[in-house]
């Protein structure tokens, strides 16, 4: 936090004064209105949904929060994620992050932020980055297939997700495991008014190209499909087409093959097309109502996509086979029953497809069994729901939220207070509501609502939703958290909001009225065996794999567990998993029901604060201790801080802890010694201990390094000394041997030479063999002298362009002749350069630069070679009015020329004056005396020019340039070679970078309205000067004809 920036309100509610419900809500409102959406209760983060993107996320903030402790910066979800990650890495303790709140409170976004933070701060490397990318890319896939727009949330999770991210001992991710809970598959066939089906259906229709839609036999119009709510086909702020492409990319990153992606989309399309199967009454001779399919083409297309005969598929939808002993009886279904079978098939296909996708993701991100790993769990599960019509789905969703609230109560409120009591720490009890009685009402194994629902589903006889409700009224009419019409009548209460087919439970979040209609069917979740067997016969590989029970060889008459039992067991496993980890809480709050930014509804927030138990949590944290740990692990971690306990301590663990803390300057109020644990009141004290430990570790590391280096140097010295003595002895002996050998060889050699010399001296006068060598040397020297004198007389002129050179008279002098020619030419060039003025040097450099840029590329370049670069073509030096265009720019004007600017809208040209200085490009109307456009050379990203005889060029500006808000500029100049050459040199001098000069007939320019493709073509040859004709070809193309 910047030093001069004060906090808005109270950042940690533990410090709130006075502490009551009203001040708590006002503090949250004050922070929310100032866009401070995060608030602490100790190490619990309260997150308010801002319903807008705030500039408080990204790499910059991640880097900031990873370098500071929890309370040193503003409250943020990154701070909690950092604490959880560091605890997992440093303390070797598995973590879980529990994200709770109502639907629409921002839980899904919070889980994404946690995962993105962990992915950013953990290790690097090719394999690690691949794992991180797969974990992150699982989110868009699961959101597409498991999220939908509801009345209260445009991106509501309609399933529960718990992800275990697994790390190695260094804190680098190895992979993960995703567990999903109770997909709301009834949404596949029916949605409430104002809601949508799952996102993937709309994304597929909006984002698939025409070829893919044709292959899937789909139409782009959502109103065509019976399973899609045509009234709400689009959601504000959500681009279904781009999201579809993102889902395809994410599936590829995770590891889905192209074939698997295609099969997933085919099965998704099948679900859509099943909703368009029209069923009609058919006449039978026996008078029994029957049904048939009136759209033969539609069922035939579905059969082709499944790889089934359409007749067989129709039979499975319109009839049912009943097995009685060894006999099979086929009964026809009426239209209502057939529609139920069709919808059940669609729901089961989609639900099993979703489970298959989760399983497939887990196969890609799973970790090998042999690796030791640490685990961080992230729970993103549907929020508490209170709708106008609450059914079985809302019942199990709210049951799950009750269990999560129970976890929070037991681990933060109840467990903490009981721990103080066990440890003998003085404590003032804080009252709170324990929702265990509600959980027991729902999940009791024998007398719970779920148990009664299963019993009703399994018992013989006539079973209906009303008999189930009657059983509940019989058992729970006197329960304090259960209400129904029967219990109200018995107590002479009159409530018109309570229907005859409804019951009400007083949840921790408020009272919810449930309509029992459909409870029995949804709990049974039955799919006729004929449909399973028919799907197993399908030739579509993915569809067939979704229905293994359809295999006649593996058919089982055992009744599958009910949906309620499956969900109850899954929640029990989840609770066991959460209890085994250290919890970190994010409590999400929805500020208003209209999803509007900046709007704070105090009553709504107060209700959520009450059932989340925020006030009780503050009181417990305020009266308690922020950190506690057993004496033994605490001593193991911090014993190095005291000389009494380091390096060895053989006494009692508690006594050792007292020695450690006694050696530090800590207040006695900050510490409390329990029976088995040490309690520390303030997080700042814990941070102080960690800082002292870090400094002590540095000291110990230095000490270890010092001792090791000393030992290594002593050992090395001893080895070197021993080796040196041995080497010296061998070396001296060998040196003497070699010295004696050399002396002896030298003596013998000298004797031989002396004898030879004496012999040659005595007998030289008798031999003439030396005369030939003397004559040869004389002749060769004479030829060389003649060659050099002749070359001196016939030297060519000192003109640089004169490349003549006399030939060598003999072949033996060819190499020397070539080298002399090279040296003479270099000498001529140096003489020529020494005679040039600075202006002539600059002119030649410009010509050289033009040659490098345009020679062999631009057709008009040869004509520009003999013409000197003038620079001023408008008489700038003699015109004070034009000189004012230069403004305060210092230095000379490199180019002053009249150019034509091409209009972005219609391609017409208009005259402009262009000035090029050492720092800017200035454009103005020829009739005005003030600069209209001033572009810094650092904003010029490049230029594009054609290879023809024209003078058209595009001035490309960097995207971050603020000089021209309308984008790039198209200009026409009669001196394009000179202008671009000098601009290239000016950019190089001003920015130390080379300007990109592209010579091409096709290039793209960026205008405010978007990119425009410019194409330059050669028209029929015209007389006189070259003419350019610019024409717009639609909104995204322009054609320039050179005549």
From Swiss-Prot:
Residues annotated to bind ATP: 101-108
Record domain Myosin motor: where: 8-694
Region: Actin-binding, residue numbers: 571-593
Processing and modification events after translation: Phosphorylated by ALPK1.
UniProt keyword terms in alphabetical order: Actin-binding, ATP-binding, Calmodulin-binding, Motor protein, Myosin, Nucleotide-binding, Phosphoprotein, Repeat
GO biological process, any: sensory perception of sound
PROSITE patterns according to UniProt: IQ, MYOSIN_MOTOR, TH1
Domain TH1: 858-1042
Top-level lineage group: Eukaryota
InterPro entries: IQ_motif_EF-hand-BS, Kinesin_motor_dom_sf, Myosin_head_motor_dom-like, Myosin_TH1, MYSc_Myo1, P-loop_NTPase
GO MF annotations, alphabetized: actin filament binding; ATP binding; calmodulin binding; cytoskeletal motor activity
GO cellular component: apical plasma membrane; basal plasma membrane; basolateral plasma membrane; brush border; cortical actin cytoskeleton; cytoplasm; filamentous actin; lateral plasma membrane
Residue ranges occupied by any IQ domain in the UniProt entry: 697-719, 720-742, 743-772
Protein family membership: Belongs to the TRAFAC class myosin-kinesin ATPase superfamily. Myosin family.
Job description of the protein: Involved in directing the movement of organelles along actin filaments.
Protein's name according to its UniProt entry: Unconventional myosin-Ia
Organism: Mus musculus
Lineage: Eukaryota, Metazoa, Chordata, Craniata, Vertebrata
């Amino acid at each position: 936090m910047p030093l001069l920036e004060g906090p808005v309100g109270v950042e940690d509610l533990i410090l709130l004064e006075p502490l009551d419900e009203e001040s708590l809500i006002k503090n949250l409102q004050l922070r929310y209105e100032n866009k401070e959406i995060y608030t602490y209760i100790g190490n619990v983060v309260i997150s308010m949904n801002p319903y807008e993107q705030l500039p408080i996320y990204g790499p910059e903030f991640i880097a900031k929060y990873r370098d500071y402790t929890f309370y040193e910066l503003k409250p943020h979800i990154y701070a909690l994620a950092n604490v959880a990650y560091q605890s997992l890495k440093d303390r070797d303790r598995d973590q879980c992050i529990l994200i709770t709140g109502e639907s629409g409170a921002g839980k899904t976004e919070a889980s994404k932020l946690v995962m993105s933070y962990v992915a950013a701060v953990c290790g690097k490397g090719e394999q690690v980055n691949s794992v991180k990318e797969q974990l992150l890319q699982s989110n868009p896939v699961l959101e597409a297939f498991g999220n939908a727009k509801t009345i209260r949330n445009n991106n509501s999770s309609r399933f529960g997700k718990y992800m275990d991210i697994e790390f190695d001992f260094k804190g680098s991710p190895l992979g993960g495991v995703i567990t999903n809970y109770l997909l709301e598959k009834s949404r596949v066939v029916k949605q409430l008014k104002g809601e949508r089906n799952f996102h993937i259906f709309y994304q597929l229709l909006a984002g698939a190209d025409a070829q893919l839609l044709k292959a899937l036999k789909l139409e782009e119009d959502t109103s065509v499909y019976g399973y899609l709510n045509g009234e709400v086909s689009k959601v504000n702020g959500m681009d279904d087409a781009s999201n579809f492409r993102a889902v395809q990319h994410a599936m590829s990153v995770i590891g889905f093959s192209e074939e698997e992606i295609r099969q997933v989309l085919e099965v998704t399309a099948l679900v859509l097309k099943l909703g368009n199967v029209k069923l009609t009454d058919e006449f039978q001779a026996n008078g029994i109502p029957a049904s048939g399919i009136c759209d033969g083409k539609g069922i035939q297309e579905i059969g082709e996509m499944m790889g089934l005969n359409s007749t067989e598929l129709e039979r499975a939808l319109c009839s049912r086979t009943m097995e009685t002993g060894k006999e099979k009886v086929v009964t026809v279904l009426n239209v209502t029953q057939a529609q139920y079978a069709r919808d059940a098939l669609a729901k089961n296909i989609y639900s099993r497809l979703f489970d298959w996708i989760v399983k497939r993701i887990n196969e890609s991100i799973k970790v090998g069994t042999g690796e030791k790993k640490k685990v961080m769990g992230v729970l993103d599960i549907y929020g508490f729901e209170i709708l106008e019509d609450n059914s079985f789905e809302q019942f199990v969703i709210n049951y799950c939220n009750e269990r999560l609230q129970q976890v929070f109560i037991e681990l933060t409120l109840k467990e903490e207070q009981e721990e103080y009591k066990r440890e003998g720490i003085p404590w003032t009890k804080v009252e709170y509501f324990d929702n265990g009685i509600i959980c027991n009402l729902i999940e009791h194994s024998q007398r719970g609502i779920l148990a009664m629902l299963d019993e009703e589903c399994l018992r013989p006889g006539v079973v209906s939703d009303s008999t189930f409700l009657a059983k509940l009224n019989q058992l729970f009419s006197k329960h304090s958290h259960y209400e129904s019409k029967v219990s109200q009548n018995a107590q002479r209460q009159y409530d018109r909001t309570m229907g005859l087919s409804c019951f009400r439970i007083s949840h921790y979040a408020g009272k919810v009225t449930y309509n029992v209609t459909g409870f029995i069917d949804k709990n049974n979740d039955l799919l006729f065996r004929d449909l399973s067997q028919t799907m197993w016969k399908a030739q579509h590989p993915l569809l067939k794999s979704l229905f293994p029970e359809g295999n006649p060889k593996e058919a089982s008459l055992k009744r599958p567990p009910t949906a309620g039992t499956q969900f109850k067991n899954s929640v029990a496993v989840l609770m066991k998993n959460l209890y085994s980890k250290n919890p970190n809480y994010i409590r999400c709050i929805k500020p208003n029901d209209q999803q509007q930014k900046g709007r704070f509804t105090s009553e709504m927030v107060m209700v959520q604060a009450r059932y989340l138990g925020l006030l009780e949590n503050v009181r417990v944290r305020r009266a308690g201790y922020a950190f506690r740990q057993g004496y033994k692990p605490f001593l193991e971690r911090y014993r190095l801080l005291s000389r009494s306990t380091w390096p060895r301590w053989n006494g009692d663990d508690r006594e050792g802890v007292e020695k450690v803390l006694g050696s530090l300057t800590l207040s006695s109020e900050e510490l409390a010694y329990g029976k088995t644990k040490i309690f520390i009141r303030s997080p700042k004290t814990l941070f102080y201990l960690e800082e002292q430990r870090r400094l002590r570790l540095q000291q110990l590391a230095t000490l270890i390094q010092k001792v090791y280096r000393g030992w290594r140097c002593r050992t090395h010295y001893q080895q070197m000394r021993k080796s040196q003595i041995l080497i010296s002895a061998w070396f001296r002996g060998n040196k003497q041997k070699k010295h004696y050998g050399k002396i002896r060889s030298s003596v013998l050699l000298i004797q031989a030479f002396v004898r030879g010399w004496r012999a040659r001296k005595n007998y030289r006068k008798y031999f003439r063999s030396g005369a030939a060598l003397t004559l040869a040397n004389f002749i060769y020297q004479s030829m060389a002298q003649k060659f050099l004198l002749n070359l001196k007389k016939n030297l060519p002129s000192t003109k640089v362009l004169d490349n003549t050179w006399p030939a060598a008279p003999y072949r033996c002098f060819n190499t020397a002749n070539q080298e002399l020619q090279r040296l003479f030419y270099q000498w001529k060039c140096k003489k020529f350069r020494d005679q040039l003025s600075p202006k002539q040097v600059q002119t030649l450099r410009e010509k050289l630069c033009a040659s490098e840029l345009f020679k062999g590329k631009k057709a008009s370049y040869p004509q520009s070679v003999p013409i000197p670069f003038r620079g001023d073509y408008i008489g700038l030096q003699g015109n004070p009015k034009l000189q004012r265009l230069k403004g305060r720019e210092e230095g000379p004007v490199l180019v002053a020329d009249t150019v034509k600017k091409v209009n972005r809208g219609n391609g017409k040209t208009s005259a402009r004056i262009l000035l090029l200085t050492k720092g800017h490009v200035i454009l103005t109307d020829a009739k005005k005396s003030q600069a209209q456009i001033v572009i810094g050379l650092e904003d010029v990203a490049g230029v594009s020019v054609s290879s023809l005889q024209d003078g058209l060029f595009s001035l490309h500006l960097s995207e971050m340039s603020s000089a021209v808000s309308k984008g790039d500029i198209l200009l026409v100049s009669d001196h394009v070679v000179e202008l671009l050459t000098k601009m290239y040199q000016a950019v190089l001098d001003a920015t130390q970078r080379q300007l990109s000069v592209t010579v091409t007939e096709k290039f793209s320019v960026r205008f405010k309205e978007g990119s425009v493709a410019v194409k330059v073509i050669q028209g029929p040859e015209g007389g006189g000067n070259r003419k350019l004709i610019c024409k717009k070809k639609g909104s995204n193309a322009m054609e320039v004809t050179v005549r």
